[in-house]
Every structure is written in structure tokens, then in C-alpha cells.
């Protein structure tokens, strides 16, 4: 048998603490909502740059490779 160490006990407690359990209430929904909204804003900004509807000073978009 191996020895029990403080680090091993800590990692086991962290790794198995939430396995198979459902968090009551809203859980991670607010965090995932914020992440989803930030991703949406990022994608909209990329789309506006691609369509040249968002103009940036000193930044030209040339898709012809010239």
C-alpha cells in the first residue's frame, strides 16, 4: 500500500467532491450565461469587422491578399 499524503488527500477531496451531484438552485447557469453573452459580443464584433461595418482607424481589411 502507498502512503497517504496531504496533497493526495486534498486532490482526492477536490476531484470527487461534486461527482454525480446536482447543485440545487441555479447552479452554474449565471456563469454560463455571462460566458455565452461575451462569446456572442465577440462574434458580432468579428462579423462587423468582416463586413466592414465596424471601421477601425489605421486597420484596413483586405481579403484579396494585396
Curated annotation (Swiss-Prot):
- What UniProt keywords apply to this chain's record, in alphabetical order? Membrane, Photosynthesis, Photosystem II, Thylakoid, Transmembrane, Transmembrane helix
Q: Name one GO cellular component term.
A: photosystem II
Tell me if NADP is a UniProt keyword of this record.
Answer: no
Supply the SUPFAM superfamilies for this chain. Photosystem II 10 kDa phosphoprotein PsbH (SSF161025)
- Compartments, as annotated in UniProt: Cellular thylakoid membrane
Say which domain of life the source belongs to. Bacteria
Q: Which InterPro entries does the UniProt entry name for this protein?
A: PSII_PsbH, PSII_PsbH_sf
| Pfam families named in the record | PsbH
Indicate the principal place this protein occupies in or around the cell: membrane
Q: Which residues cross the membrane?
A: 27-47
Source organism per UniProt: Prochlorococcus marinus (strain MIT 9301)
* Membrane disposition: Single-pass membrane protein
Could you state a single Gene Ontology molecular function term?
phosphate ion binding
Task: State the family it belongs to.
Answer: Belongs to the PsbH family.
Which gene is this protein's source?
A: psbH
Which GO biological process annotations does it have? photosynthesis; protein stabilization
Q: What is this protein called?
A: Photosystem II reaction center protein H
Organism lineage string: Bacteria, Bacillati, Cyanobacteriota, Cyanophyceae, Synechococcales
How would you summarize the oligomeric state and partners of this protein? PSII is composed of 1 copy each of membrane proteins PsbA, PsbB, PsbC, PsbD, PsbE, PsbF, PsbH, PsbI, PsbJ, PsbK, PsbL, PsbM, PsbT, PsbX, PsbY, Psb30/Ycf12, peripheral proteins PsbO, CyanoQ (PsbQ), PsbU, PsbV and a large number of cofactors. It forms dimeric complexes.
Its function, per the record, reads: One of the components of the core complex of photosystem II (PSII), required for its stability and/or assembly. PSII is a light-driven water:plastoquinone oxidoreductase that uses light energy to abstract electrons from H(2)O, generating O(2) and a proton gradient subsequently used for ATP formation. It consists of a core antenna complex that captures photons, and an electron transfer chain that converts photonic excitation into a charge separation.
